């Protein structure tokens, strides 16, 4: 076992106050993300045309945004739909699923993380 400290072990992650506080656009909407959330070369505008678009955007928002930004950008119903498809650090799963037990589990990610 290594005593190495990784950024994933120390990086702070924010979590919104409640899922009901999430007021972002649903599928078909548009998100405008700042560089502090996503480093896109040309535009931080993401059209939520498909669940894949939402998965891409939500992964960045959950990993990088403040709780206030998460509440403004995320949509509860869309989050519940894409949560099992998100690829997140294990600490993020722990933080979010502890606070929001109604989130569906991503069994594949949890099986991998428990190794």
Where are these regions (language model features)?
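Long, compositionally biased intrinsically disordered regulatory segments in eukaryotic proteins
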Residues: 1-115
